[in-house]
Each structure stands twice: as structure tokens, then as C-alpha cells.
């Protein structure tokens, strides 16, 4: 009876993506417990037990991945700021070796870090909200995983873009800067890749619990309550407020010459990102 139950549990664990050392550990602990009690019926149906393990492992793993992703991206953000701060005067945008690739790399260097920063913070916000939960709905975990994936992907794109930018515009950049850019990009991509591997491993586990995913307003409710704009439940009002704030910062930083152009660009980019990724990242329902 016990051996048959263990075979059923092994199959059910595999069905929800629990394999390898995790499955062997669960089966060993289950076998010890059943041999002590001898009561298979009271232990629970194998499918329900497997689903419970999947929910708990996916929740804890996704939460760890969220923090790991942020820790991988934080030094990347510092390195990005230092690298760009070292450029006194940027090269002529039309001086790239392969102009379409050069312009694409320049746009990536501008946009990808902003996406990585925003989604990284959103990932941590969701993980922090779920910090005391043992198991959460599959939809919640899906949002957490997608945010981490976009944050890591954007971070990797940013430093790939920097490396390409350094190559494409090497004629207009100091040689020491291009060398530094290549070295820093390679170093930064290592922890990002490590976090991505951890995310991929966690994504193999398929949680079974049903329930709503929640949205941005659930993640940052305490902060929104401090803002007198009645933002809760009004995602586009929140989006426009953020877009205006980002555009204002770009206007001030760019000065009278480039400020207006940069402000319009940032405003459109924020709104487009919210429209395109809002539901995917759980920012709005």
C-alpha cells in the first residue's frame, strides 16, 4: 500500500513540475512518515498533496527569485550610471559603423534601464507584499515571475546595448571608455544570468491554487494612500501622473535645448509601456 502511494505521489509531483532532488526529498520524507504511522488514507490524496507542495515551492521560490533579481540588478544600475556619467560629450548619433544597429543600441541604452528599474521595483513590491504567505494563487506567482523576467531581460538588454554602443561609436568615444564598457558589461551580465537560471528553475514548478492575481494598487497600497489624487482603482490616472513626473525630470535634466524633446519622448514611452505591458505585468486588471 505504501509503495503504491509513493509511486502515485511521484507521478503527481512530476505532473506539477517537481522533479530531481526536490522530488526525491519529498518522497523520502513521505515514506518515513507513512512507515511511522502506517495510515496512508489519512495522509491525503496524492494529487492534492502534490498540488500543495507545488503551491508552497512555487511561492517561496518565486519570492526568492524576486529578491535575487533585484540584488543582481542593483549593482548593474550603479555601473550603468557611472559608465554614462564618464562620457563628457556623446558621439554624433550618425557616426555609427552600421547606422541602424547603432541607433537601435542607443535607444536600448536609454529605454532598457528604465524598464529594468521600474519592473525590478515592482517585482520587489509584489514579493514584499507576499512575504508572510506560505502559498498564493498561481496567478499571483505568474505575475511575480513575469515581472522578474522582464526586469532581468531588460537589464541584460541594457548592457548588451552598451557593449554594442561602445563598438558602433568607438571612433567618437575614448578608447579607455570602450574597453571599460566591454569589461563592465560582461561582468554585470554574469549575476543577471545567474538570476535568470534561478527563475527558469522556479518556472518549472506549476502551482495549482486558484485566485486573483491582484494589481499594482494591491502592491503599493500604503504609498498610494499618501497621495491625494484618488489613484486606487484608476490605473490610467496613475500612469499619466507617473508619465508627467518622468517627463518633468527629463525636461529639467535636458535643459532648454534637449529638454522638451526628451520630455515628450519619455511621456510617450511611459504611456506606451503601460499600455503594452500593463496587463502582462499585473499593473492593471
Name the predicted role of every residue range.
Residues 60-285:
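Hydrophobic alpha-helical bundles in membrane proteins
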Residues 1-71:
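Negatively charged linear elements and acidic catalytic determinants
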